């Protein structure tokens, strides 16, 4: 028995068939994209593993760093003798709080003739600038002198390194120290470093051959070659001068008030 089918019925069947094909194609594409996304996520997790909560908690928010730097460790052929001289820094702490030790001194004929130690707390106060505060001890020459002080260190415009500190000591003594240094990169390994240091005192200290006012200044020019960043030999020249009452005290002891000499040494850190 044949059942008559109208034209409208045939059209409806065709539309249903076409819709079913579209749904099947959509489901196939969705499955393919889903597998691709899962594969990409697996690759990402393999390359960048996610930290578990316990691992994240074990990582310190503010890690501790440390460093020891001998900026100068050198031989100097001064007018009266050959001298071993050093200028070193050591620090340990976090980005926000550090302990800093500065040490400068000289040895001549097996005896320490100059020795200055500074123990400072350091905290950043601006971009490229730190506030420093602490104590200082001068053990040579003469009688040991102790100070407390506050100052700044950092980079001025044109990358000029600055250390400036004001000190208050025993018996009403006051002092100020200033160090300026600039590193000129001639190549990636050849570096020229001019440096100036000066001391100013508020009172005479004849026992330690220190006069009131602008006391002394050192100006040097050093040329180093960095075999590695951590190790660099250098040569240079340095000029030292005493002024004012300090120069008068030196003359009264038959000591030179001006001197220029060659230096050769090593700069290293770890």
Stretches found by the model and what they are:
Residues 144-205:
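Detector for outer-membrane/organellar transmembrane beta-barrel domains
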Residues 92-94, 123, 154, 168, ...:
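Residue-level signature of outer-membrane beta-barrel architecture
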Residues 96-100, 127-131, 158-162, 187-192, ...:
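Repeated loop/turn-to-beta-strand initiation elements of outer-membrane beta-barrel proteins
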Residues 64-66, 82-86, 113-115, 144-148, ...:
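Residues that define the transmembrane beta-barrel architecture of outer-membrane proteins
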Residues 88, 119, 150, 178-180, ...:
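Membrane-embedded beta-strands of outer-membrane beta-barrel proteins
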Residues 221-226, 257-270:
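Outer-membrane beta-barrel "beta-signal"
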Residues 8, 13, 38-111, 115, ...:
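Outer-membrane beta-barrel initiation region
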Residues 72, 101-105, 133-137, 164-168, ...:
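Transmembrane beta-barrel strands of outer-membrane/channel proteins
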């Amino acid at each position: 028995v044949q059942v008559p089918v109208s034209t409208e019925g045939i059209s409806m069947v065709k539309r249903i068939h076409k819709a079913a094909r579209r749904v099947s194609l959509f489901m196939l594409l969705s499955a393919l994209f889903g597998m691709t996304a899962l594969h990409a996520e697996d690759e990402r997790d393999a390359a960048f593993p996610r930290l578990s909560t316990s691992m994240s908690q074990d990582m310190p928010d503010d890690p501790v760093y440390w460093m020891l730097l001998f900026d100068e460790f050198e031989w100097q052929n001064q007018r009266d003798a050959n001298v071993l001289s050093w200028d070193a820094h050591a620090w340990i702490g976090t980005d926000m709080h550090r302990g800093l030790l500065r040490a400068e001194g000289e040895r001549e004929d097996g005896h320490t003739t100059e020795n200055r130690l500074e123990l400072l707390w350091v905290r950043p106060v601006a971009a490229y600038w730190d506030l420093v505060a602490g104590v200082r001890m001068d053990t040579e020459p003469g009688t040991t002198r102790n100070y407390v002080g506050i100052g700044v260190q950092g980079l001025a415009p044109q990358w000029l390194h600055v250390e400036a500190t004001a000190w208050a000591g025993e018996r009403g003594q006051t002092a100020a120290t200033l160090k300026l240094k600039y590193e000129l990169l001639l190549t990636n390994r050849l570096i020229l470093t001019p440096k100036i240091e000066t001391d100013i005192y508020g009172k005479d200290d004849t026992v330690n051959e220190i006069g009131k006012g602008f006391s002394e200044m050192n100006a040097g020019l050093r040329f180093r070659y960095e075999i590695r960043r951590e190790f660099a030999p250098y040569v240079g020249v340095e000029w030292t001068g005493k002024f004012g009452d300090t120069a008068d005290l030196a003359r009264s002891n038959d000591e030179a008030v001006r001197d220029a000499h060659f230096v050769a040494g090593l700069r290293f850190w770890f």
